[in-house]
Amino acid sequence: MGDFVLALYDETPQHRDNFVKLAEEGYYDGVLFHRVINNFMVQAGDPTSKTADSTAVLGEGDPGYTLPAEFVFPKYFHKRGALAAARTADQVNPERRSSGSQFYVVTGRVYSSAMLDDMKKRIGDQRKQQIFTSLAMEHMDSIKAMQARSDMAGLQALQQEFIAKTEAQYAAAPYEFTQEQIEAYTTVGGTPHLDGQYTVYGEVIQGYDVIDKIQNVTTGANDRPIADVKILSMRVIRPEKK
């Protein structure tokens, strides 16, 4: 389909160095883009995809380690062309550690200002729910004790206390889109709902048309392309020293 070039961010050194190491070792040569979702992202980096047949369910392979999250948000976010690390879900990965090898490139979609406003409210509501749940978990022994003695008044008072604390905590750091995010999401597009949750450590600087070709292929079960889309080779281009 063609070539594309990625630039890696110095502010995410562990992800940068790991990606360079794997590329230089030939780790990515022959791996498939095993998960492709139009207007969302294209994902690769599962080493088991090199030898997988057409019926294999992919996405679990890795080099045997994870990387600590390196969020540089809001400076780096999920605009079109962003390179980010895949990872397992929060329920099993509360630290949001990254896969040691799997990555995705954002394709996304363009949003209107009104759509971003709606999304900001939804994200805010989600964060409030997370704060409330965290408070409840911290006081679970008290909650269970009140439930055991059927202390409904106490439970209701505790709930109101949690609601007030939730509102205060959220008000101290509400979710807002930066001007850079708004400009990007309303022009070139992206996937704003992933911001601050996955490590963004680079971006496509050349050959985005190739990413577009990949995102438009026909896919089947588990969003895997019907016809394999393979990384033939990956090489590292180091900037010339001045």
Q: What annotation goes with each model-predicted range?
A:
Residues M1-K242:
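Cyclophilin-like peptidyl-prolyl cis-trans isomerases
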